[in-house]
Amino acid sequence: DAEQHGEVALKDANAKLQDLKAALQQAKEDLARLLKEYQELMNVKLALDIEIATYRTLLEGEECRMSGECQSSVSIEMVHNTTSSSSGGSGALGGGAGGRGGLGSGGLGSGSLGSGRLGSGGRGSRASRGNLALDSSSGGGSAVRGSVSNSGGSCAVSGVGGRGSVRVTQSSSQSQRSHHKL
């Protein structure tokens, strides 16, 4: 009788062990799915942070230029590598005064940086010059090289391994101007 009781307890323990193994496997699959979703969201966040920083820097430079107090040199550098891939896309980093551009389908967050122009636009000003060209690099990264002309400046994006990073710098030099009323 005790032997039967022991066998039943062993079967119950094995059944619980199998249930726990199945639950562990399901949890691992869920964790992998959530990690992939998190990485995709972080790629989108990085792209949006880049776009926000670019527009902020360009706006500050344009305000300074329009006030005539300084000449601005804008330098934007973004390094990004992604392991996800896209079936193509037409997104653009930036956009002109007409509001075209932005992150399109298959934009930077999906593994490719769309072709387009990086322009300042707005408040009746002309868009800054600066074409961006897409270069593919090994390892799933994307690279864009180009320049932005807002009284000088440059934009360089390189695909490298590791996590993405953004660096936006702006240097201004005061120009002495005197206005005389006649």
UniProtKB/Swiss-Prot annotation:
Residues 67-86 are annotated as: H2 subdomain. Keywords: Coiled coil, Intermediate filament, Keratin. Residues 104-124 have a biased composition (Gly residues). Belongs to the intermediate filament family. Gene3D superfamilies: 1.20.5.170. Residues 67-182 are annotated as: Tail. Residues 144-158, 165-176 have a biased composition (Low complexity). The record marks Q4 as: Stutter. Residues 1-66 form the IF rod domain. This is Keratin, type II cytoskeletal 68 kDa, component IA. InterPro entries: IF_conserved, IF_rod_dom.
